[in-house]
Protein backbone atom coordinates (compact mmCIF):
# COMPACT_ATOMS: atom_id res chain seq x y z
CA UNK A 1 0.00 0.00 0.00
CA UNK A 2 1.21 3.48 -0.79
CA UNK A 3 0.14 6.54 1.17
CA UNK A 4 -0.41 9.86 -0.64
CA UNK A 5 -1.22 13.27 0.84
CA UNK A 6 -1.13 15.42 -2.33
CA UNK A 7 -4.04 15.74 -4.76
CA UNK A 8 -1.64 16.24 -7.67
CA UNK A 9 0.43 13.19 -6.76
CA UNK A 10 -2.71 11.06 -6.41
CA UNK A 11 -3.99 12.14 -9.83
CA UNK A 12 -0.65 11.32 -11.46
CA UNK A 13 -0.56 7.89 -9.86
CA UNK A 14 -4.15 7.08 -10.82
CA UNK A 15 -3.61 8.30 -14.39
CA UNK A 16 -0.96 5.59 -14.75
CA UNK A 17 -3.32 2.95 -13.34
CA UNK A 18 -6.08 3.98 -15.75
CA UNK A 19 -3.61 4.00 -18.66
CA UNK A 20 -3.19 0.29 -17.92
CA UNK A 21 -7.01 -0.10 -18.01
CA UNK A 22 -7.06 -0.91 -14.30
CA UNK A 23 -10.48 -0.53 -12.67
CA UNK A 24 -10.62 1.65 -9.56
CA UNK A 25 -12.83 1.11 -6.53
CA UNK A 26 -13.02 3.84 -3.89
CA UNK A 27 -13.84 3.77 -0.18
CA UNK A 28 -14.06 7.18 1.55
CA UNK A 29 -13.61 7.15 5.34
CA UNK A 30 -12.90 9.55 8.18
CA UNK A 31 -10.60 7.06 9.86
CA UNK A 32 -11.09 5.46 13.30
CA UNK A 33 -11.60 2.25 11.37
CA UNK A 34 -13.65 -0.75 12.47
CA UNK A 35 -14.80 -4.01 10.87
CA UNK A 36 -17.48 -2.17 8.92
CA UNK A 37 -14.86 -0.11 7.09
CA UNK A 38 -12.69 -3.18 6.54
CA UNK A 39 -15.60 -5.00 4.88
CA UNK A 40 -15.89 -2.11 2.40
CA UNK A 41 -12.15 -2.24 1.62
CA UNK A 42 -12.28 -5.99 1.06
CA UNK A 43 -15.28 -5.75 -1.25
CA UNK A 44 -13.72 -2.89 -3.22
CA UNK A 45 -10.50 -4.88 -3.63
CA UNK A 46 -12.39 -8.01 -4.69
CA UNK A 47 -14.31 -6.14 -7.39
CA UNK A 48 -11.58 -3.86 -8.78
CA UNK A 49 -7.94 -3.97 -9.87
CA UNK A 50 -7.05 -1.04 -7.62
CA UNK A 51 -8.60 -0.18 -4.26
CA UNK A 52 -8.27 3.47 -3.23
CA UNK A 53 -9.35 4.59 0.24
CA UNK A 54 -9.28 8.00 1.85
CA UNK A 55 -8.99 9.16 5.43
CA UNK A 56 -10.18 12.73 5.83
CA UNK A 57 -12.16 14.16 8.73
CA UNK A 58 -14.29 16.62 6.81
CA UNK A 59 -14.99 19.76 8.88
CA UNK A 60 -17.85 20.81 6.58
CA UNK A 61 -20.13 17.96 7.63
CA UNK A 62 -19.98 18.58 11.38
CA UNK A 63 -22.75 20.91 12.49
CA UNK A 64 -21.50 20.51 16.08
CA UNK A 65 -17.87 21.73 16.54
CA UNK A 66 -17.54 19.67 19.74
CA UNK A 67 -18.39 16.52 17.76
CA UNK A 68 -15.65 17.38 15.24
CA UNK A 69 -13.08 18.00 17.99
CA UNK A 70 -13.92 14.68 19.68
CA UNK A 71 -13.73 12.58 16.51
CA UNK A 72 -11.13 9.85 17.23
CA UNK A 73 -7.83 10.07 15.31
CA UNK A 74 -5.67 6.93 15.10
CA UNK A 75 -3.64 7.22 11.92
CA UNK A 76 -1.02 4.50 12.53
CA UNK A 77 -3.48 1.74 13.40
CA UNK A 78 -5.80 2.87 10.57
CA UNK A 79 -2.97 2.59 8.04
CA UNK A 80 -2.10 -0.89 9.28
CA UNK A 81 -5.72 -2.03 9.02
CA UNK A 82 -6.07 -0.54 5.53
CA UNK A 83 -2.95 -2.32 4.31
CA UNK A 84 -3.96 -5.67 5.81
CA UNK A 85 -7.44 -5.40 4.24
CA UNK A 86 -5.97 -5.00 0.74
CA UNK A 87 -6.03 -1.23 0.16
CA UNK A 88 -3.59 -0.28 -2.61
CA UNK A 89 -3.60 3.52 -2.33
CA UNK A 90 -4.44 5.49 0.81
CA UNK A 91 -5.21 9.19 0.30
CA UNK A 92 -4.74 11.24 3.47
CA UNK A 93 -4.84 14.97 2.69
CA UNK A 94 -4.79 17.57 5.43
CA UNK A 95 -7.45 20.28 5.53
CA UNK A 96 -5.17 22.88 3.88
CA UNK A 97 -4.53 20.53 0.93
CA UNK A 98 -8.18 19.61 0.49
CA UNK A 99 -9.70 23.03 1.20
CA UNK A 100 -7.06 25.73 0.44
CA UNK A 101 -9.87 28.16 1.18
CA UNK A 102 -13.11 27.25 2.91
CA UNK A 103 -15.76 26.62 0.24
CA UNK A 104 -18.38 29.35 -0.07
CA UNK A 105 -20.80 27.18 -2.01
CA UNK A 106 -23.45 24.95 -0.47
CA UNK A 107 -25.28 22.09 -2.15
CA UNK A 108 -29.05 22.03 -1.71
CA UNK A 109 -30.02 18.39 -1.33
CA UNK A 110 -33.76 19.07 -1.38
CA UNK A 111 -36.13 16.84 0.59
CA UNK A 112 -33.39 14.56 1.92
CA UNK A 113 -31.96 17.56 3.79
CA UNK A 114 -35.27 18.16 5.57
CA UNK A 115 -36.00 14.72 7.04
CA UNK A 116 -34.35 12.38 9.55
CA UNK A 117 -30.63 13.29 9.77
CA UNK A 118 -31.16 16.36 7.59
CA UNK A 119 -33.74 17.80 9.98
CA UNK A 120 -31.51 17.27 13.02
CA UNK A 121 -28.10 18.13 11.53
CA UNK A 122 -28.49 21.32 9.46
CA UNK A 123 -25.81 21.66 6.79
CA UNK A 124 -24.50 18.13 7.32
CA UNK A 125 -25.46 16.72 3.94
CA UNK A 126 -24.27 19.79 2.06
CA UNK A 127 -20.86 19.17 3.64
CA UNK A 128 -21.04 15.48 2.71
CA UNK A 129 -22.01 16.32 -0.88
CA UNK A 130 -19.12 18.78 -1.26
CA UNK A 131 -16.43 16.44 0.09
CA UNK A 132 -17.72 13.45 -1.89
CA UNK A 133 -17.98 15.52 -5.10
CA UNK A 134 -14.37 16.66 -4.69
CA UNK A 135 -13.16 13.14 -3.98
CA UNK A 136 -15.04 11.76 -6.99
CA UNK A 137 -13.51 14.43 -9.25
CA UNK A 138 -10.01 13.76 -7.91
CA UNK A 139 -10.14 9.95 -7.96
CA UNK A 140 -12.65 9.24 -10.76
CA UNK A 141 -13.45 5.71 -9.57
CA UNK A 142 -15.68 3.29 -11.45
CA UNK A 143 -17.31 2.19 -8.20
CA UNK A 144 -17.58 3.75 -4.74
CA UNK A 145 -18.48 1.85 -1.57
CA UNK A 146 -20.52 3.09 1.39
CA UNK A 147 -21.98 1.45 4.48
CA UNK A 148 -25.74 0.89 4.68
CA UNK A 149 -25.65 2.10 8.30
CA UNK A 150 -25.64 5.62 6.87
CA UNK A 151 -28.73 4.86 4.77
CA UNK A 152 -29.59 8.53 4.22
CA UNK A 153 -26.03 9.41 3.22
CA UNK A 154 -26.18 6.64 0.60
CA UNK A 155 -29.44 8.14 -0.72
CA UNK A 156 -27.86 11.62 -0.86
CA UNK A 157 -24.82 10.34 -2.75
CA UNK A 158 -26.96 8.36 -5.20
CA UNK A 159 -28.95 11.54 -5.87
CA UNK A 160 -25.70 13.49 -6.30
CA UNK A 161 -24.32 10.94 -8.78
CA UNK A 162 -27.58 10.84 -10.73
CA UNK A 163 -28.17 14.59 -10.95
CA UNK A 164 -24.54 15.56 -11.64
CA UNK A 165 -23.88 12.67 -14.06
CA UNK A 166 -20.93 11.15 -12.24
CA UNK A 167 -20.06 7.93 -14.16
CA UNK A 168 -19.76 6.03 -10.88
CA UNK A 169 -21.65 3.03 -9.52
CA UNK A 170 -22.57 3.44 -5.85
CA UNK A 171 -22.40 0.21 -3.86
CA UNK A 172 -24.19 0.07 -0.49
CA UNK A 173 -22.64 -2.62 1.72
CA UNK A 174 -24.41 -4.40 4.61
CA UNK A 175 -24.25 -3.09 8.17
CA UNK A 176 -21.61 -4.89 10.23
CA UNK A 177 -22.69 -5.44 13.84
CA UNK A 178 -21.07 -6.42 17.11
CA UNK A 179 -22.23 -9.73 18.65
CA UNK A 180 -24.70 -7.73 20.74
CA UNK A 181 -26.32 -6.31 17.60
CA UNK A 182 -24.84 -2.82 18.08
CA UNK A 183 -24.00 -1.35 14.67
CA UNK A 184 -20.27 -0.84 14.20
CA UNK A 185 -19.39 2.86 14.38
CA UNK A 186 -16.29 4.93 15.08
CA UNK A 187 -18.36 6.70 17.73
CA UNK A 188 -18.64 3.44 19.71
CA UNK A 189 -15.05 4.08 20.87
CA UNK A 190 -16.42 6.86 23.05
CA UNK A 191 -18.77 4.50 24.92
CA UNK A 192 -17.91 2.70 28.15
CA UNK A 193 -18.44 -1.08 28.31
CA UNK A 194 -21.72 -0.43 30.12
CA UNK A 195 -22.70 2.16 27.51
CA UNK A 196 -22.08 -0.33 24.72
CA UNK A 197 -24.26 -2.91 26.48
CA UNK A 198 -27.07 -0.38 26.83
CA UNK A 199 -26.66 0.85 23.23
CA UNK A 200 -27.23 -2.70 21.95
CA UNK A 201 -30.90 -2.14 22.80
CA UNK A 202 -31.15 0.32 19.89
CA UNK A 203 -30.95 -2.57 17.42
CA UNK A 204 -33.21 -4.69 19.64
CA UNK A 205 -35.86 -1.97 19.36
CA UNK A 206 -35.61 -2.13 15.56
CA UNK A 207 -36.03 -5.91 15.76
CA UNK A 208 -39.11 -5.45 17.96
CA UNK A 209 -40.60 -3.21 15.28
CA UNK A 210 -39.76 -5.74 12.55
CA UNK A 211 -41.56 -8.51 14.47
CA UNK A 212 -44.57 -6.25 15.09
CA UNK A 213 -44.82 -5.53 11.37
CA UNK A 214 -44.03 -8.93 9.84
CA UNK A 215 -45.51 -11.35 12.40
CA UNK A 216 -48.10 -9.38 14.33
CA UNK A 217 -49.28 -7.30 11.34
CA UNK A 218 -49.78 -4.15 13.42
CA UNK A 219 -50.20 -0.64 12.00
CA UNK A 220 -47.27 1.67 11.32
CA UNK A 221 -48.19 3.80 14.32
CA UNK A 222 -48.49 0.81 16.67
CA UNK A 223 -45.17 -0.64 15.47
CA UNK A 224 -43.47 2.70 16.06
CA UNK A 225 -44.95 2.93 19.56
CA UNK A 226 -43.79 -0.62 20.33
CA UNK A 227 -40.21 0.36 19.49
CA UNK A 228 -40.39 3.53 21.57
CA UNK A 229 -41.96 1.66 24.50
CA UNK A 230 -39.14 -0.88 24.39
CA UNK A 231 -36.52 1.88 24.54
CA UNK A 232 -38.37 3.70 27.33
CA UNK A 233 -37.16 0.92 29.65
CA UNK A 234 -33.65 2.33 29.41
CA UNK A 235 -33.23 5.75 30.98
CA UNK A 236 -29.67 5.88 29.56
CA UNK A 237 -31.04 6.01 25.99
CA UNK A 238 -32.33 9.37 24.74
CA UNK A 239 -34.16 8.91 21.43
CA UNK A 240 -33.86 11.79 18.97
CA UNK A 241 -36.05 10.22 16.30
CA UNK A 242 -37.50 6.82 15.46
CA UNK A 243 -39.24 6.74 12.08
CA UNK A 244 -40.71 4.14 9.75
CA UNK A 245 -40.09 5.27 6.18
CA UNK A 246 -40.25 4.17 2.56
CA UNK A 247 -36.86 2.58 1.85
CA UNK A 248 -36.43 4.29 -1.52
CA UNK A 249 -37.36 7.89 -0.62
CA UNK A 250 -36.90 7.77 3.20
CA UNK A 251 -40.17 9.68 3.56
CA UNK A 252 -42.27 8.76 6.60
CA UNK A 253 -45.20 6.45 5.92
CA UNK A 254 -48.50 6.08 7.75
CA UNK A 255 -49.59 2.79 6.15
CA UNK A 256 -48.04 -0.10 4.24
CA UNK A 257 -50.18 0.20 1.09
CA UNK A 258 -48.06 0.05 -2.09
CA UNK A 259 -44.87 -0.43 -0.03
CA UNK A 260 -42.63 -3.41 -0.81
CA UNK A 261 -39.60 -2.31 1.21
CA UNK A 262 -39.51 -0.04 4.24
CA UNK A 263 -36.81 1.08 6.66
CA UNK A 264 -36.88 1.78 10.37
CA UNK A 265 -34.43 4.60 11.13
CA UNK A 266 -33.26 5.78 14.53
CA UNK A 267 -30.92 8.30 16.12
CA UNK A 268 -30.33 8.17 19.87
CA UNK A 269 -27.86 9.34 22.49
CA UNK A 270 -26.07 7.05 24.94
CA UNK A 271 -23.55 8.60 27.36
CA UNK A 272 -23.71 11.77 25.27
CA UNK A 273 -22.68 9.91 22.10
CA UNK A 274 -25.04 10.19 19.13
CA UNK A 275 -25.66 6.84 17.44
CA UNK A 276 -27.67 6.01 14.31
CA UNK A 277 -28.97 2.70 13.00
CA UNK A 278 -31.55 1.34 10.60
CA UNK A 279 -33.21 -1.88 9.59
CA UNK A 280 -34.62 -2.49 6.11
CA UNK A 281 -37.74 -4.68 6.07
CA UNK A 282 -39.04 -6.47 2.98
CA UNK A 283 -42.85 -6.65 3.08
Swiss-Prot record:
Subcellular compartments:
Cytoplasm
Q: Write one Gene Ontology MF term.
A: pantoate-beta-alanine ligase activity
**This protein's encoding gene:** panC
Q: Give EC number(s), comma-separated.
A: 6.3.2.1
Annotated binding of ATP, by residue: 30-37, 147-150, 176, 184-187
Q: What does this protein do?
A: Catalyzes the condensation of pantoate with beta-alanine in an ATP-dependent reaction via a pantoyl-adenylate intermediate.
The name on file for this protein is Pantothenate synthetase
Q: Where is the active site?
A: 37
Q: Which family does it belong to?
A: Belongs to the pantothenate synthetase family.
- Catalysed conversion reaction: (R)-pantoate + beta-alanine + ATP = (R)-pantothenate + AMP + diphosphate + H(+)
Species this protein is from: Cytophaga hutchinsonii (strain ATCC 33406 / DSM 1761 / CIP 103989 / NBRC 15051 / NCIMB 9469 / D465)
Give an example GO cellular component term for this record. cytosol
Query: Matching SUPFAM superfamilies, A to Z?
Result: Nucleotidylyl transferase
This protein's UniProt keywords: ATP-binding, Cytoplasm, Ligase, Nucleotide-binding, Pantothenate biosynthesis
Enzyme class of the recorded protein, top EC level:
ligase
Lineage runs:
Bacteria, Pseudomonadati, Bacteroidota, Cytophagia, Cytophagales
Pathway field of the UniProt record reads: Cofactor biosynthesis; (R)-pantothenate biosynthesis; (R)-pantothenate from (R)-pantoate and beta-alanine: step 1/1
Amino acid sequence: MISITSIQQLRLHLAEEKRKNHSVGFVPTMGALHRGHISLIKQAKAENTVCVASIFVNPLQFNNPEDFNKYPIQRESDMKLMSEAGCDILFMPDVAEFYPTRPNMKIDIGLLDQILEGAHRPGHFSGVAIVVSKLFHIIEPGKAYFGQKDIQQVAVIRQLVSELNFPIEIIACPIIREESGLAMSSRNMRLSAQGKAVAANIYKALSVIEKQIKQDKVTVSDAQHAGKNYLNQFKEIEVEYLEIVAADTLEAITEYADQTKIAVCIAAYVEGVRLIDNLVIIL
